[in-house]
Design a protein with these regions (language model features):
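Residue-identity detector for threonine
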Residues: 53, 74, 110, 121-122, ...
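Short regulatory "switch" loops immediately downstream of catalytic or recognition motifs
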Residues: 56-62, 84-88, 107-109, 146-155
């Protein structure tokens, strides 16, 4: 043993064991780092300070604190909630497989309430409303709600229509103080995107059914001209 070789054999075995234990205790954080460095990402002190600032800003924001930290105990909370689900599809391939990774889903079975929370970073938190439109975040949230509907029906054996639904985007500025704002996305804006999701998935399913990917569906079904 290398530790044995480094010490005089004249030392009592109990003494050497005690010193070894003291060394392990002294360097336990260092040892733990090397044990986990391949499976866990180690962040810098600068990144740690940044995350602490963002957390503090969230805790000091009334609504962000409510949905991230000070929520009622009746909620069960799922962070980075991965759902493998299926979209109903009448084709030779059957239902279309989908995947969703939701930042945060809060389910309160006692009060029949489901809260979907999406966290975004932005260069300008004050103009984030424009980002919602530019990047069509409501379409993304509609896709997430499809996943939640499937989860309720197939995993929980419950009807989501019996629950009230709330959707929030927490926007965090990516510089200069990391300010936080929370946006309540009303159901009407999400429901307006349901048909967009349905059309997109049906189109993808058609291409998969027919193994045709170079052009849009209308190209193959028509004369090759595409409508604007």
């Amino acid at each position: 043993m290398s530790y044995n070789a480094a010490y005089s054999n004249n030392k009592p075995i109990n003494k050497r064991i005690q010193e070894a234990k003291e060394l392990v205790e002294l360097y336990k954080n260092y040892i733990e780092y090397f044990r986990n460095k391949d499976s866990k990402k180690v962040i810098s002190f600068a990144d740690l300070a940044l995350l602490k600032t963002i957390k503090q800003n969230m805790q000091e924001h009334k609504k962000a604190n409510e949905i991230l930290f000070a929520y009622p105990k009746t909620f069960e909370v799922h962070n980075e909630f991965h759902i493998n689900w299926e979209f109903p599809n009448d084709s030779k391939l059957g239902d279309f497989p989908c995947k969703s990774l939701l930042d945060r889903v809060m389910i309160d079975h006692t009060n029949k309430k489901v809260v979907l929370v999406d966290i975004k970073t932005t260069a300008d938190v004050y103009n984030f409303r424009h980002s919602i439109e530019e990047f069509d975040y409501c379409r993304q949230l509609a896709y997430y709600w499809f996943a939640i509907y499937w989860y309720f029906k197939n995993e929980l054996k419950l009807d989501l229509e019996e629950y009230t639904r709330e959707t929030y985007i927490i926007a965090v500025q990516s510089h200069d103080g990391y300010e936080v704002k929370v946006f309540n996305i009303e159901n009407q804006y999400i429901e307006a995107k349901v048909c967009v999701i349905e059309d997109a998935i049906k189109r993808i399913a058609w291409h998969k059914d027919n193994d045709l990917w170079d052009h849009i569906k209308e190209y193959y079904e028509g004369d090759g001209a595409e409508l604007l």
